[in-house]
Design a protein with these regions (language model features):
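N-terminal Rossmann-like NAD(P) cofactor-binding subdomain of oxidoreductases
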Residues: 1-168
Length: 168
């Protein structure tokens, strides 16, 4: 793949966000360009924002240590710098739904690790080996949200994604 997609992590300082950081390091398809988190972390370097809470077994990648964390609630600022975001925020479900829809409405696709939209009828919950065709619902979601490019797709929970392929 020649093009690398510019991606952001919304909820970058939490444990799931940290995991996304490690997974995206040196990824051939994705270039991590934005780290976003709560207002408490905004304006700090990623290293300072996370501090001693780094929970991964590998050291924090050098490539992200000095990146400035953006405020995840400043949707337009984040969305303007990426092709899409991975969402790993830790907040009440109604707030997650509103935030993810705000990103989608800003024409920024959202790949969510959260459960907030898992039962939203026009949001695909994708296990690629099993139901990749479920992305066909995205045009209906875009119509509801009034978007051309923005949408939300969610992953299943970790237990489900591990045993569904074997059952299929």
């Amino acid at each position: 793949m020649e093009k690398q997609y510019k991606v952001g992590i919304v909820g970058a300082t939490g444990m799931v966000g940290q995991r996304f950081v490690t997974l995206l390091e040196n990824h051939p398809w994705f270039k991590l360009t934005v780290l976003a988190a709560s207002g408490r972390s905004a304006g700090k370097s990623y290293e300072d924002a996370v501090g001693s809470r780094w929970a991964m077994t590998t050291p924090m990648p050098e490539s992200v240590k000095k990146m400035t964390v953006l405020d995840a609630s400043k949707v337009e600022e984040v969305a303007s710098q990426v092709d899409f975001v991975f969402c790993a925020v830790n907040m009440p479900k109604d707030e997650i739904k509103a935030l993810e829809e705000a990103y989608a409405k800003a024409e920024c696709p959202v790949v969510s690790n959260n459960s907030a939209h898992r039962f939203t009828s026009d949001v695909p919950m994708v296990v690629p080996e099993i139901n990749a065709d479920h992305i066909e619902i995205i045009p209906a979601q875009r119509k509801r949200l009034g978007t051309k490019r923005g949408f939300i797709a969610v992953k299943s929970n970790c237990s489900l994604q591990s045993y569904v392929p074997a059952l299929h």
